Amino acid sequence: MGKFDEQKQIDSVNGALALRPQIEELIDRLLAEGVKNLCWLGIGGTWASCMQVVCYLKEHTDMDTFATNAAEYCTTGDKRVGAGTLVVLSSVTGTTTEIVDAVRLAQRHGAKVLGFIDKPDAELATLVDYCISYKGNEQLKFFMVADCFLRRQGNFPDYDTYYAQMDAYLAKDLV
């Protein structure tokens, strides 16, 4: 592991965890505005990350939550996406055609879009309603959104303890 940069990995995970207050504030605002369902939008590997968080949420909440493949959504649509929907996505480049097109379609149907976009100057970063730019740790960012919803619904009573432990130990324990 001659080229492995342990400190870089620790800093990366801790940086993602530091986004949590921003995520919590946004989720609080969206819940107050009446978000009723969650659409996790992806393509390729990001779609796989979406499916993981949906499986997790289905176990813990009765809130409608689903993963949608961006190309499929652009082709067939999804009647669940509309006013009251929060679409959550992640993009490294911010230029994937299917994701860009799906965001435009979801917004035309009244959905709000939260994008974790690695490049803050990418086209997609300007299209989404809420952009949080931070490189890497897609799954961690997705699960922080999910956990925040669970907490606000009363379905994650140990949230504060859990995240205190995540802040204290996760980054170091992963390396």
What are these regions (language model features)?
Residues 15-50, 175:
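A short, flexible N-terminal coil/short beta segment enriched in small residues
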Residues 1-25, 29-32, 150-164:
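Cofactor-/ligand-binding subdomain signature composed of acidic, glycine-rich
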Residues 33-169:
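Glycine-rich phosphate-binding loops that contact phosphosugars or nucleotide phosphates
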